[in-house]
Amino acid sequence: GKTKGLTAILKTEVCCNQNLAYLIADEKYLHYRYLFYCFKAMYFYIRGLVGESQAGIYSYFLKKLHIPLPDIEQQIRISDYLDTKCEAIKNSINKRERIIEKFTSYKRSLIYEVVTGKKEVQR
């Protein structure tokens, strides 16, 4: 399905079924946010490994993945950098979406006003 291969960081206890993989990083060696970004980077690769016809991703495939493992301090620096950049990108996208919404609303109003005769069309 569409959600196959998606990643998330959960900060609460959850119940999951056989269609989810739950990973806990040993913080001495692997920072959880770094692991999150590694899986985000490998999203299309992971989906390609199992193919579109397969319903899920089995632990067999996850065990075969190679995750680059710099020292923990570097992992944290990488994660902090990506957090900052991804947040800035998300904010930029949100700002542009609000602008698009305003133009879309203006376009609808313009069409309505012209079609109903509330606004005169000049030649």
Predicted regions and their residues:
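Basic, amphipathic alpha-helical recognition segments used for DNA target recognition
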Residues: 9-13, 20-73
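Amphipathic alpha-helical coiled-coil/heptad-repeat segments
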Residues: 69-123
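Short, charged beta-turn/beta-strand-edge "cap" motif at the junction between a beta-strand
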Residues: 1-6
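N-terminal start-of-chain detector that recognizes signal peptides
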Residues: 7-8, 35-41, 81-85, 93-94
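N-terminal alpha-helical segment
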Residues: 16, 58-61, 85, 107
